Amino acid sequence: MVQVKDTLNYEQPTKYLVTNTDYSSDISLIPVLTANKSFVLGYTDEEFGIYDKGQSIIFDDFTMDIKFVDFLFKVKSSAIKILTAKPNVNLKFVFEYLSFLNLSSNEHKRHYISEIEPMEIQLPNYIQQTYVADFLSSIDDKIKTEFEFHMLLIKQKQYLLANLFI
C-alpha cells in the first residue's frame, strides 16, 4: 500500500487559467477544460498559459470529478488540481484506480490535500501498472468503437424508416 501523495505531483492551475470566458466552438483552438461532466467548456485563442507538459489528471477539488488529459489545454477554475505521475508510476493506472473509487462529495470544500493525498492505494510494479492501464485503455477504445457503430445503426434505421413511409 502506498499513499496517493507518493504517486502523484500536483500543481495549482493559476498560470493556466483562461482570462476570456467568451469561448469559441472552433476545435482548432486550445480547449478550456473543467473536470465535471461537460469537460470541454469551449475553445480559446489565448496563446499564453497553456498546459503543455504532457499527460495529466485534472481533479476538481470541490466535486472530486476527475479527467485524464493527454493534450494541450487551459482551465476555467482555480479549484482544479493538475496531477502528474511521480517516477515509476503509470498515470493512467492511478487515474483508473481513482475512477474506480467513484469519488464524490456534496460538501463545498477542498478535498485533495486533506482526503485524497493521504488515501492508501495498491500500487503494483511499473510493468504491471502499464499492463493494466493499457488493457483498460483497449477496453475504452472498444467501448468507443461500439458506441460509434451503435449511433450509425440508429442513423441507418432513421433513414430506412424515413424512406419506408414516404
Stretch-by-stretch model annotation:
Residues M1, L91, K157-Q158:
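Alpha-helix initiation and N-capping motif
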Residues M1-K37:
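Non-catalytic DNA-recognition/assembly elements of restriction-modification systems
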Residues V4-D6, M64-L123:
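Basic, amphipathic alpha-helical recognition segments used for DNA target recognition
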